[in-house]
């Protein structure tokens, strides 16, 4: 897997950098694993915008991905690697020995024809799913369950992985991609290896239109709005914010304010908090 650059034939190709699709072998998705999904466009059940800058984009069909890996002891072969428009990771199409077909997140290094398993006593190989208590220390895992049987909820984006740091009784300490160290129950399942398509972090859309194809609408700065639309708006010309610091459109402090509850019950499972990203290195824009 590599990235592809373009000559500056047009302004849109001058800075365009995309991943090549050499690892994608299947042109069309498996029909039995595809469903139609209504796109919310950032609206809630009342039609009110709860997530700004969403809407439009190319039509998509949702791929049913197996995050639980609950077919224990049944071998499966990797039949194809498919593209998924809903995530930046690739999907591996599995053909199980009993005839069932399922999608899983394609780990880095997985190949066509490789056999994968899930269960307590399966080999320690990339693509196999095991309980965290059965995985050796120092191993890289992804698609980690937070609760047994609920399915993988953490470490699912392209190029990400968590590392097993220690085993303490019925819990396992995981170092997450955010550098947070968290305790997870040992019977929770995880998949060995890291998620593939790690080169996605080196890509560049190149033009605004490609972002619209992905369903992202323009972000308008608050300082160019009217005072009735944003706390930063109004004034003559390029006026300053007029407050002690930048705020959200609803008047709450932005860029660095902690939003996690202090007395959240799951705080006792966090051994080390994630590394805070400074405002300067984040390069945040005027909300």
Curated annotation (Swiss-Prot):
GO function term, MF aspect, one: rRNA binding
Organism: Prochlorococcus marinus (strain SARG / CCMP1375 / SS120)
NCBIfam families cross-referenced by the UniProt entry: rplB_bact
Pfam families: Ribosomal_L2 (PF00181), Ribosomal_L2_C (PF03947)
Presence of the UniProt keyword Ribosomal protein in the record: yes
Protein family per UniProt: Belongs to the universal ribosomal protein uL2 family.
Highest taxon of the lineage: Bacteria
Function per UniProt: One of the primary rRNA binding proteins. Required for association of the 30S and 50S subunits to form the 70S ribosome, for tRNA binding and peptide bond formation. It has been suggested to have peptidyltransferase activity; this is somewhat controversial. Makes several contacts with the 16S rRNA in the 70S ribosome.
Extent of Basic residues compositional bias: 258-287
Assembly and interaction partners: Part of the 50S ribosomal subunit. Forms a bridge to the 30S subunit in the 70S ribosome.
Gene Ontology CC annotations of this record: large ribosomal subunit
Segments for region (Disordered): 221-287
Protein name: Large ribosomal subunit protein uL2
PROSITE patterns assigned to the protein according to its UniProt record, in alphabetical order: RIBOSOMAL_L2
rRNA-binding keyword on record: yes
GO annotation, biological process: translation
InterPro entries membership: NA-bd_OB-fold, Rib_uL2_dom2, Ribosomal_uL2, Ribosomal_uL2_bac/org-type, Ribosomal_uL2_C, Ribosomal_uL2_CS, Ribosomal_uL2_dom3, Ribosomal_uL2_RNA-bd_dom
């Amino acid at each position: 897997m590599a990235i592809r650059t373009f000559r500056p034939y047009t302004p849109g190709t001058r800075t365009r950098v995309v991943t090549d699709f050499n690892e994608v072998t299947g042109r069309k998705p498996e029909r039995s694993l595809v469903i139609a999904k209504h796109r919310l466009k950032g609206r809630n059940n009342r039609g009110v915008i709860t997530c700004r800058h969403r809407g439009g984009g190319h039509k998509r069909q949702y791929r049913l991905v197996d995050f639980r890996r609950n077919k224990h002891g049944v071998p499966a072969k990797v039949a194809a690697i498919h593209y998924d428009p809903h995530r930046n990771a690739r999907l591996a199409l599995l053909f199980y020995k009993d005839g069932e077909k399922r999608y899983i997140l394609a780990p880095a290094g997985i190949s066509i024809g490789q056999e994968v398993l899930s269960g307590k006593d399966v080999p320690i190989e990339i693509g196999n799913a095991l309980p965290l208590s059965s995985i050796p220390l120092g191993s890289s895992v992804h698609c980690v369950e937070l609760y047994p049987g609920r399915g993988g909820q953490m470490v699912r984006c392209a190029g990400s992985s968590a590392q097993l740091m220690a085993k303490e009784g019925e819990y396992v300490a995981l170092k997450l991609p955010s550098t947070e160290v968290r305790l997870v129950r040992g019977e929770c399942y995880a998949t060995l290896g890291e998620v593939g398509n790690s080169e996605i972090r080196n890509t560049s859309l190149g033009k605004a239109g490609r972002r619209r194809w992905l369903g992202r609408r323009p972000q308008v700065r608050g300082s160019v709005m009217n005072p009735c639309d944003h706390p930063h708006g109004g004034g003559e010309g390029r006026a300053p914010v007029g407050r002690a610091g930048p705020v959200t459109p609803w008047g709450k402090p932005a860029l660095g304010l902690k939003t996690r509850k202090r007395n959240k019950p799951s705080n006792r499972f966090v051994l080390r908090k994630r590394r805070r990203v400074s405002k300067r290195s984040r390069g945040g824009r005027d909300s």
